[in-house]
Amino acid sequence: MSEEMQYEYLVPLEKYLSAGVRLGTRLSNKYLEDRGFIFAVRPDGLRIFDIKKIDERLKIAARFIARYPPDRVLVHTTRPYGFKPVQMFCKYVGCKALTGRFIPGTLTNPNLPHYQEADLLFVVDPKLDAQAVAEAAKMGVPVIALVDTDTPHQYIDFMIPCNNKGRKSLALIFWILARQVLRERGELKPDQDLPVPPEEFETRLVQT
């Protein structure tokens, strides 16, 4: 039996594929290429992530997050499709959610009313969330980030390569992480799921 057949994914491979988790952009970051995160390039130029590496990084990230007191972990996104996944993740894991604009000084100026203390920052897109990443670096706060093929890697301590733009991808990623963090803490059994499916983490499109 091949190593690929023996590897146990956190969710069935088909779930990753249907959610578009492995789909990158047409731009490529050599830093990610050199680390083997980018598996292939489609004829249309779209970069494809290695799903096994995504899965492996999710397992490591969950162990890392589980080491911190939940109220010392700040999860931030300015990407609208990330609002619901981040809020649901924080609901189940107990972390602090910060969605929308990141006000300068949030991590660096304790005199501001919106000041937040954190021992770990988790961002959805380091390009859009650059202010938060820069402030975390200044304060010595480690940063976990979802990174697409076009994402800069500066100041990121741990990268999770994935499609960090799609609704379904973000929902599945945060659902997996929430479940895995709770398993790492012993709050869920190793074979136990969250009480809601990944679809409940998904941002709903509003019909106009």
UniProtKB/Swiss-Prot annotation:
InterPro entries: Ribosomal_uS2 (IPR001865), Ribosomal_uS2_arc (IPR023454), Ribosomal_uS2_euk/arc (IPR005707), Ribosomal_uS2_flav_dom_sf (IPR023591). SUPFAM superfamilies: Ribosomal protein S2. One of its GO terms (cellular component) is small ribosomal subunit. Residues 189-208 are annotated as: Disordered. It holds the Pfam family Ribosomal_S2. Gene3D superfamilies: Glucose-6-phosphate isomerase like protein, domain 1. Keywords: Ribonucleoprotein, Ribosomal protein. GO terms for molecular function: structural constituent of ribosome. GO terms for biological process: translation. Belongs to the universal ribosomal protein uS2 family. This is Small ribosomal subunit protein uS2. It comes from Pyrobaculum arsenaticum (strain DSM 13514 / JCM 11321 / PZ6).
